[in-house]
C-alpha cells in the first residue's frame, strides 16, 4: 500500500475540519501523525484505532500522515511557493555548517553533505535517501564515485531497513529548496 504524507504549516487546522480517527502504534499509544479518514475499529472515547497501524495496513486500512512542516510558515501565497520552488538555490550554502544545521532533514549531516556536494533536486533526493538506514551502505560508493554511481541502487526497495522511496525523497528535496530560498529571501529583505 502506498505511503502518503501530507505536509501542513499547521496540521491541526486540517484535522479540525476533517473527520478522522487517530492511528495507533504497536505500543498502544497514539501515532504522532497518522490518521484514518475512513471507518476503522476504534475506541469512541479516545478516537484512536483499536488496531495498530501495521495490523490495520495488513487488513487493508489506509493511513495518511498529516505532518507539520514549519518551513511553510514563510510562504505567503501559492505563487510565492512556486517562485521559491522554481528558483535555483545556492547549493554551496549546504556546505556551510551554520546554514546546513538550519535545514530540514539535513541538519546534523554537514560533514557528509560537504563531501557529496549535491547540486540538483535529484542529487539532494539521493542524499536524503542515503542517510536512511536501508541505504547507508551506499555512502562510501557515492563518496568515491559520485551520485551517478548509486542511481541504480538508491531507489531499489529494501526489506531489512527503513528507506526513502524516490517520490518521498524528491518531495522533501523540494521542501529543502523552498527552505533554502526562503532563508536567502529573508536575509535579502533584512539588508534592503
Positions of the model-derived regions?
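Mg2+-dependent phosphoryl-transfer active-site scaffold
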Residues: 1-192
Amino acid at each position: 500500500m502506498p505511503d502518503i504524507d501530507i505536509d501542513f504549516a499547521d496540521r491541526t487546522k486540517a484535522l479540525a475540519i476533517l473527520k478522522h480517527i487517530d492511528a495507533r502504534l504497536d505500543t498502544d499509544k497514539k501515532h504522532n501523525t497518522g490518521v484514518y479518514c475512513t471507518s476503522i475499529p476504534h475506541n469512541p472515547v479516545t478516537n484512536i484505532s483499536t488496531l495498530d497501524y501495521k495490523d490495520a495496513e495488513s487488513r487493508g486500512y489506509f493511513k495518511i500522515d498529516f505532518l507539520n512542516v514549519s518551513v511553510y510558515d514563510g510562504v505567503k501565497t501559492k505563487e510565492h511557493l512556486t517562485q521559491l520552488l522554481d528558483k535555483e538555490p545556492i547549493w554551496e550554502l549546504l556546505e556551510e555548517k551554520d546554514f546546513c544545521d538550519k535545514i530540514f532533514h539535513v541538519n546534523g549531516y554537514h560533514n557528509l553533505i560537504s563531501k557529496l556536494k549535491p547540486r540538483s533536486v535529484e542529487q539532494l533526493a539521493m542524499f536524503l535517501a542515503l542517510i536512511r538506514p536501508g541505504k547507508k551502505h551506499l555512502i562510501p560508493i557515492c563518496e568515491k564515485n559520485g551520485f551517478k554511481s548509486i542511481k541504480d541502487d538508491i531507489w531499489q526497495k529494501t526489506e531489512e531497513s527503513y528507506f526513502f522511496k524516490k517520490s518521498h525523497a524528491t518531495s522533501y528535496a523540494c521542501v529543502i529548496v523552498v527552505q533554502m530560498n526562503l532563508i536567502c529571501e529573508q536575509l535579502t529583505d533584512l539588508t534592503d
